[in-house]
Amino acid sequence: MGRFISVSFGLLVVFLSLSGIGADQECLPGWSFYEGHCYKVFSEYKNWVDAEQYCTEQENGGHLVSFHNREEVDFVVKLGYTILKADIVWIGLRDFWRECHWEWSNGAQLDYKGWSDEPNCFIAYTVGNKWLRRKCSSTQQFICKARVPH
């Protein structure tokens, strides 16, 4: 009986591993999984354009992080603070044409807002969960978001 339970448990572990239930196993090493996407915090300081380019070079479909609900913001804020112990990171939101037409660097529609009125790129505080506009030429640490690799 003990051998049957042991074998059954072993098969369950193998099945769960292969089916992708093991969270971070769906992302490349160093990336964190949440709701179908992979996230990675970078401690390098870059301006917004260079940070976005760096994200696109990291993984297929990668961009500076975009948010689509409060739960995703909470996950990313916690991830950023845990790794960096810093309070500000670039996010993918920018007024590309300087006409107050805000969109994410990955082309997604802005469907969740969290900022005060102020330049043309956005930072997020990893403490207090606030977004602020900042000059795109200033340098910050950043977080990339990418699709899960297939």
Swiss-Prot record:
One of its GO terms (molecular function) is toxin activity. It is found in: Secreted. It holds the Pfam family Lectin_C. SUPFAM superfamilies: C-type lectin-like. InterPro entries: C-type_lectin-like, C-type_lectin-like/link_sf, C-type_lectin/snaclec_domain, C-type_lectin_CS, CTDL_fold. Expressed by the venom gland. One of its GO terms (cellular component) is extracellular region. SMART domains: CLECT (SM00034). Residues 34-145 form the C-type lectin domain. Disulfide bonds join 27-38, 55-144, 121-136. It comes from the Eukaryota. Keywords: Disulfide bond, Hemostasis impairing toxin, Secreted, Signal, Toxin. Residues 1-23 form the signal peptide. Belongs to the snaclec family. Interferes with one step of hemostasis (modulation of platelet aggregation, or coagulation cascade, for example). Heterodimer; disulfide-linked. This is Snaclec CTL-Eoc125. It comes from Echis ocellatus.
